[in-house]
Swiss-Prot record:
GO terms for biological process: dorsal/ventral axis specification; dorsal/ventral pattern formation; proteolysis; Toll receptor ligand protein activation cascade; ventral furrow formation; zymogen activation. This is Serine protease gd. The active site is at H295, D350, S471. Expression begins in previtellogenic stages and is seen in germline-derived nurse cells of the germarium. Expression continues throughout oogenesis with transcripts from the nurse cells accumulating in the oocytes. Most abundant in the ovaries, the level of protein decreases from the moment of egg laying and is essentially gone by 4 hours. It comes from Drosophila melanogaster. Residues 1-19 form the signal peptide. InterPro entries: GD_N (IPR031986), Peptidase_S1_PA (IPR009003), Peptidase_S1_PA_chymotrypsin (IPR043504), Trypsin_dom (IPR001254).
């Protein structure tokens, strides 16, 4: 008897020690997700507002817990249960119960989304062995137009609901595959008319703030622009040759970037178990296809899979996870060009196609760019100025501006969480090789070289190469009032030491060059995924 009591006491002490060591998780978003205890087990309580009453509500929850999954845990990974039944008003929250795996402690919430819109984002566990669980739930809900609370159930409706089958809930539900759809010609490469601009504008109009689009719904259908409407807009801008004559020598002809001005910009994140980290940029070219660089997903012995990658569309400020009209798009597949070899120094065929699980709805902030059309010969674009846009994050997920500011006293950090846009004059290989002989080994007949024409204020304020962290970003050239994707960023010239003895930090030379994968050389391969 005494031995039995001692064994029980040891088990109790062990459980208490584990609880103190691990600690009970705290909800990262207590307004929409809370941990509850019913006396026997822990569960999660989630409140979600349906973003669109005409579509099924698709809930996705990603959980993180310490250790390897046990046999008992593998048999039951948890589930999402719809708590509130009956009809809902559009503004009323829908309540869900998150049942956790049979484990001593509830897992931490890593990500929660509704119809691909991230509504809660947290950090995972920190341990040598980690287990991630993804739960999904899809249900078509009935909505009523009146303002009665959805939590006050109709007794007759409740009786009907009791006879219904259990709501479909499975840890790994299969998405219904939709056919790939090429971007409509009316949309691709065009910007909402309220945000549209040409590469070169009159200097006096550069500092006029561009307002947000006058749309009350961030996920409405796009505004189509007919060919004859371009003539109506043309009088607002001047020809590039005319604009260059009145530009100042400080290269300040680029407008301040606003949200929605580059709606095909994609932010690609990778799941590193404990957090989502920014990895690369990308370019949306259809409702399901994003183009990026191969080295973003395959470098030496590391290869990211589709389950480890999440693509954000419609994003501008990467610190703001709740931007209207943006969405988090799960990835169905990552296809790296078969000729790409991460073990070699050459960046030949450094291109990848990311296929999204679901087609995205185009809106003011999410639109595709056009794939290149016309000749694929590089010599035909030498001398032209393209546009490169992307976020300049390094691999530690700090912006290069912030990193420099922490190292240099008196330097103020600029907001590099927003994308930066720069001009990229396309040059021949000879000029590129003269700038840096190492580019000869990096390039091939399927790459081209372009410079970075930085604005003076960026060069002096940031004092660092803010343009070398934009792997996967696209280089766009305007053709017939449309922006066309011609290249993706592969390799940049390393920063050089400044001759100024007082400044020991590295500066990006004003005439920096970057190697791009020539998208025009891979159109046949890309089109196979788009059609």
């Amino acid at each position: 008897m005494r031995l039995h009591l001692a064994a029980i006491l040891i088990l109790c002490i062990e459980h208490v020690t584990k609880a103190v060591a691990q600690g009970m998780p705290i909800s990262p978003c207590p307004k929409v997700f809370q941990y509850r205890f019913d006396g026997s087990e822990w569960f999660g309580l989630m409140a979600v507002r349906s973003p669109d009453g005409h579509q099924p509500l698709h809930i996705r929850v990603t959980l993180s817990m310490r250790g390897k999954p046990t046999t008992y845990t593998q048999n039951y990974l948890g589930e999402i249960e719809l708590l509130t039944r009956g009809k809902f008003t559009h503004n009323a929250p829908v309540l869900y119960k998150i049942r956790f795996p049979k484990h001593h402690f509830p897992p931490k919430l890593l990500l929660m989304s509704a119809n691909n819109h991230v509504i809660c984002f947290g950090s995972g566990e920190h341990s040598i062995f980690m287990t991630q669980i993804q739960l999904e739930h899809i249900r078509k809900l009935s909505f009523i137009p009146d303002k009665k609370s959805s939590l006050l159930l109709d007794p007759e409706e409740e009786e009907v609901r009791k006879t219904d089958d259990k709501p479909p809930s499975t840890p790994h539900i299969q998405f219904k595959k939709k056919p790939f759809a090429q971007a409509p010609k009316e949309i691709c490469g065009r910007i909402d008319r309220d945000l549209d601009f040409h590469l070169s504008q009159r200097t006096e109009s550069l500092h006029v703030a561009i307002g947000e689009p006058k749309s009350s719904d961030g996920i409405t259908s796009p505004v189509f622009v007919d060919d004859d409407e371009d003539d109506v807009l043309e009088h607002q801008f001047v020809d590039e040759s005319e604009a260059e004559a009145i530009e100042s020598d400080s290269a300040d002809s680029l407008p301040s970037i606003t949200r929605g001005s580059w709606p095909w910009l994609a932010a690609i994140y990778v799941n590193n178990l404990t957090s989502l980290d920014f990895q690369c940029g990308g370019s949306l070219v259809s409702a399901r296809v994003v183009i990026s660089s191969a080295h973003c997903f395959k470098l030496f012995n590391k290869r990211y899979t589709s389950n480890e990658v999440l693509v954000f569309l419609g994003r501008h400020n990467l610190k703001n996870w709740n931007e209207e009209g943006s969405l988090a798009a799960p990835v169905d597949g990552i296809y790296i060009h078969p000729d790409f070899n991460s073990q070699l120094s050459s960046y030949d065929a450094d291109i990848a196609v990311i296929i999204l699980k679901d087609e995205v709805r185009f809106n003011t902030f999410i639109r595709p760019a056009c794939l290149w059309s016309g000749s694929s010969k590089t010599e035909y674009i030498v001398g032209e100025r393209g546009i490169v846009i992307g976020w300049s994050f390094d691999r530690t997920n700090r912006t290069r501006d912030q990193k420099l500011s922490s190292e240099l006293p008196g330097k103020k950090s600029t907001d590099a969480s927003a994308p930066k846009v720069v001009k990229a004059p396309i040059v021949g290989n000879a000029e590129c090789f003269r700038a840096n002989a190492h580019f000869r080994s990096l390039s091939s007949n399927r790459t081209f070289c372009a410079g970075i024409q930085a604005e003076e204020r960026d060069t002096h304020q940031s004092g660092a190469s803010i343009y070398t962290g934009i792997s996967g970003a696209g280089l766009f050239i305007r053709r017939n009032n449309r922006w066309m994707l011609r290249g993706t960023v592969s390799a940049a010239l390393p920063a050089v030491e400044t001759p100024d003895a007082e400044s020991s930090h590295k500066l990006c030379c004003k005439n920096q060059y970057i190697i791009y994968a020539d998208v025009a050389k891979f159109l046949d391969w890309i089109t196979a995924f788009v059609i």
